[in-house]
Amino acid sequence: MARELAAVYAQVFDLAAEVSLLGYCDPSSIDKRCVMANSNKVFKLCESLLPCLRLQNDTECSPLSLELQHLLQNTREALGVLTDLLSGDPSRSEYFEALHPSRPLEGPCKRHARVRVPFYGGAEKTVSLSLLNDVEVFFKRLNSVFYCLPAEGALEALGETVAFLGRLRGVSPIPPADAYVSSVPCASCFAEAAMLPNQGESVLSMLAAVNCNHVCRQVPSDPVIGVFENELRHLGADARAAGRAGGGRESERRGREDADDEEDDEEEPRDGQGDAGDGAALRVLTESSLSVLAGHTIFEEEDGRLAEISNLVYWSSAADRGGVGGTARATSSSHMAKLFAHEARMHRSRAWLGRGAPSHFFDAHRPSPLESLFCGGVFNSIDDTIAALQKDCSATFLKKSNYQTLIQQQNELYVRLNEVLNGAGRDEGGAKGAEAIADAEPLKPDGGASCDPRDVLSDARVRRDLYLKKLTRDGLRRLTDCIETHGRVLSDTLSLRVWGSALYASAARLVNHFLFRRQFVGLGWADLTAGGEAAFENSKYIKNALHGQRLNREHLDSIVVHFYRLITGPLSLQNSHFPVPDNVALAYCLDAAGAMPHQKLVITEMIWPGIESKDWIDCNFNSFYSIETGDLNLTQKKTLNYIREAVLSISLYNRVWEKSLSLLSATELRGSCLAESASGELGEGVYLTYEGTAPLVLVFDSKGYVFKDLYTLLYTHLQLSGRRQASV
């Protein structure tokens, strides 16, 4: 069945991606009949498939089934909106405004949600969701306190959260850029960190500079400069010719600019005539700036705006003094400016090739140069932008003529050595130079080395040149490393990302955990939660027998690890070839949820070496996992006490009566409880369901018994196991 589901998912995914593109196309270029036909097909598919998907997701879900349900719902809704819009023959502005409104719509915002989470004891928390990271963080926090809330309340909260995730999912394979942050580690990041040697670092410090690639997967992009030019050549056109053939003086001017840009790309010097317009604009800007600065003297307070204008005037004047003509123009040319000019030229070429061509969304709403730094362009990618920025940074730094001078001046050793060499070099054979050498003695020979001043000077000059080369080489290497590092940061931040699998995988595991708990409780076990006088006496008998016994200290470590495993959330339990220890899995579970040190201390102090039975046995009868009114911290403390009581009492019971009764958790069930129960795969033991109405289930000889009192359960197991031994 999974293969058929994957095949349907692939087809629906492709259709949803194409529907997402229709929202940015010229409405006059869209085939209305094709849209209506696809809309009818999707409506029929939803009528037949969506009820089955909902039924499956309410029994045992998977990441694929959850995302497919969202894609079907969103595609049906998007096609319905498109069909209604296209039926009215809207203009381009009306079409784009309806699909991409510039003003917020009335009514509740689909990009925000508030989810109420009920816990035992009447405590509840309200979680605000607005980003994909908020959903993922909520999953991690719920994973750390899964034993503090009932399955029904958890499924209701998870249902609202998954529905909010579906609204963010939309139909596009690209998530909204403002809907996620890549610097927040997800549960998969913590799982990967568990595989790495920490070298004494905490997992939080290891993930401090993480670039999460699981919630939204980064797509490696390649530079696209030159791809569209090749397409133009195949069509028998040239980008420059197309740009100049637009007609009119404006096209002629643009054609001249295009020719200038092309020659800039080839780095050919020009006579500077093409800079007349830019030079005039620069002079006007400089004159207006100087007029603003004219009234400022040293007696006035310094203004940040005036300081910025003064700096700009200073650096622009330094650039003017750098040279004239084509050489200065070539050296001051920016790779980013060439990129913007290339984008504009290709847009003009596209308009010239397809006269009367459709005007799409990016034609009516082009990004500004500053915005294009973050989103790229139609004819250049983010990688092209980052490469241009790197070239501009390195070129700007290397153009400074005083680069080596600054290095020399900052080095005290070189300054001293240079003074000695220059003083001696002016009068190398004279007494004055000899006295300077004798007074300074920068390099005093040892042993039988030559004492000729000429050799000393020659050696010093060689050392000076080598030292300068080393400084220059190291400086350039550090500059290159710095630019590459920041380039990677920009690439991680600005690169295109598509939907990852982490969110739906976490949602499926959490939903399945609470579904299995609800299914397990409702399997039709024999209900022995009513208690009674006989059950009270049986419970008292077991308690009295355990009170005089002590735990085996040799097995205390394994008992503690078992306790840790029972309170480790389903997202942190690993079923892989390289599982981490249970205590490490719990530590990562708490770190991922953002637990504070004092909260971890409460867990580590639950079991100590000298613990006795009176420290954990509850004197109340038939009240296991009964939480009174209190806040979440008190609820968590009480649930931990109940889980500790089950672990220690069953361990002591096995030691006293030489039994091998196992305490299992609902989190260890990897498949549907209904399927495992029907096939008889449920093993014997005590199952901790974390449900207040039926917390303990004893499975023995393929029969189940529900208890609210732990010691009545142990007495029942003692009787059933004794009958089995007697029959043998």
Curated annotation (Swiss-Prot):
| Cellular component terms per the entry's GO annotation | host cell nucleus
Instruction: Write one Gene Ontology MF term.
Output: zinc ion binding
- Record flagged with keyword Nucleotide-binding: yes
**What keywords does the record list, in alphabetical order?**
ATP-binding, Host nucleus, Late protein, Metal-binding, Nucleotide-binding, Viral genome packaging, Viral release from host cell, Zinc, Zinc-finger
Q: Does the keyword DNA repair apply?
A: no
Q: Which GO terms describe its biological process?
A: viral DNA genome packaging
- Give the source's domain of life in one word: Viruses
Q: Where in the cell is it found?
A: Host nucleus
For ATP, which residues are the binding ones? 653-660
Q: Pfam families recorded for this chain?
A: PRTP
**Biased segments, Acidic residues type:** 258-269
| Biological function | Component of the molecular motor that translocates viral genomic DNA in empty capsid during DNA packaging. Forms a tripartite terminase complex together with TRM2 and TRM3 in the host cytoplasm. Once the complex reaches the host nucleus, it interacts with the capsid portal vertex. This portal forms a ring in which genomic DNA is translocated into the capsid. TRM1 carries an endonuclease activity that plays an important role for the cleavage of concatemeric viral DNA into unit length genomes.
Q: Which family does it belong to?
A: Belongs to the herpesviridae TRM1 protein family.
UniProt xrefs under HAMAP family: HSV_TRM1 (MF_04014)
What's the subunit arrangement here?
A: Associates with TRM2 and TRM3 to form the tripartite terminase complex. Interacts with portal protein.
Name of the molecule in the record: Tripartite terminase subunit 1
This protein's species is: Equine herpesvirus 2 (strain 86/87)
The protein's gene is named TRM1
